[in-house]
Amino acid sequence: MKTTDKIIADYKSRFMAELKTKNPGETEFHQAVSEVVDSVVPYMVQYPYLMEQKVLERMVEPERVIMFRVPWVDDRGEIQINRGYRVQMNSAIGPYKGGIRFHASVNLSIMKFLAFEQTFKNALTTLPMGGAKGGSDFSPRGKSDAEVMRFCQSFMTELQRHIGADTDVPAGDIGVGGREIGYMFGQYKRLRDEFTGTLTGKGQYWGGSLMRPEATGYGACYFAEAMLATRGESFAGKRVCISGAGNVAQYAAQKAMRLGAKVLTLSDSDGFIYDEEGLDEEKMKFVFELKNIRRGRIKEYVTKYPHAKYFAGERPWRIPCDIAMPCATQNEIEKTDAENLVKNGCFCVTEGANMPSTPEAIAIFQGAKILYSPGKASNAGGVATSGLEMTQNSMRLKWTAEEVDQRLRTIMADIHEACIKYGTEEDGYINYVKGANIAGFMKVANAMVEQGLV
């Protein structure tokens, strides 16, 4: 008779071996699935029907994967070809929902990992949304507005046949902001001759929701607030290191400042800035203008504010801080970075990006018993507010910023409570990874079982 531990170990080993055989070379996807498997399999064995129905095996297999060519013409008149993707992972609890990423690193593995993570994140929001992700290996960086528009129109010309307000509702992600959403929505409307909430992140005057740009960064701070409260702490007076300088990082920095923290760093792919005095409203106004209007590099910050320092080719995790908020990209915090953070006094890591910490880094955070939340929980504010935008579109109305912000706060508080429910361990330590994975998994799993083998 096998012991429970033996059953769990054998199942994990067999499951991951089969996954890697079926999905060779997809390291990001393997990593995302492995984290979920570690959390949910010990829970699954308590409910034999989940094993019998092979729910996890079905969950890691996308319902549909769409890959297509995206031809466009650059400003020199030369033809360029990029590759587009849409991974429609799971629709058990609602229409597919997930962002579109334009970045040179985009490949099928990254799209599948993001779509898999999105499924759990969307389930955590309590809103009826399935999981998906899309994108292209096209990078808007260095491209003219006209080139970006031509690419977006070509991309949407193919994608439009696979999406819809009740089928699949894309949004923005890295490389896809309001400009790109606008170009894609315009092309969708032209081709389909309909004005529906098929994309979220739209402009405020044509169906967008107030607070959508702020939502991911603000939501991460609201989640961090709830985490800190479990230890009788708050943002007030805390030193915060933030990576990234895009939408998520900008608004995480703004909200952390307004909650009384001293934000020390921002970064982009070239390096990071360290402002020992801390960012303030005036400095953030400059960052917004630099990144969103001029689309410049973060190193220009030190030209404007010479007291700050710029570190080329580095990440900000060696700067002493109390709270770290990785808001850039996947696997940006590695083992050495995690060791530096813990050694320098960091006691709270709240992820604003998707899977920004490697498994080795997460093990260090949890081993040190510091507060650590995975992106699927703490950065769910963005997709939650996208869901609220879908609701407003379907009702043909518009809520005030205060109404949206209050709903966002409630959703982040509910996600935190779900993490506590499923993630509190015997010694009282809250394992937010375990809590988020089990809470999201059970909602999707039960929906799949109840809907039959489809």
PLM regions and their residue ranges:
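Rossmann-like adenosine-cofactor binding region
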Residues: 271-372, 377
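General beta-strand structural signal in soluble alpha/beta enzymes
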Residues: 167-171, 194-199, 242, 265-268, ...
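Glycine-rich phosphate/diphosphate-binding loop of Rossmann-like nucleotide-binding domains
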Residues: 200-203, 208-320
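Active-site nucleophile and cofactor-binding loops and adjacent substrate-binding regions
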Residues: 77, 173-174, 209-216, 241-245, ...
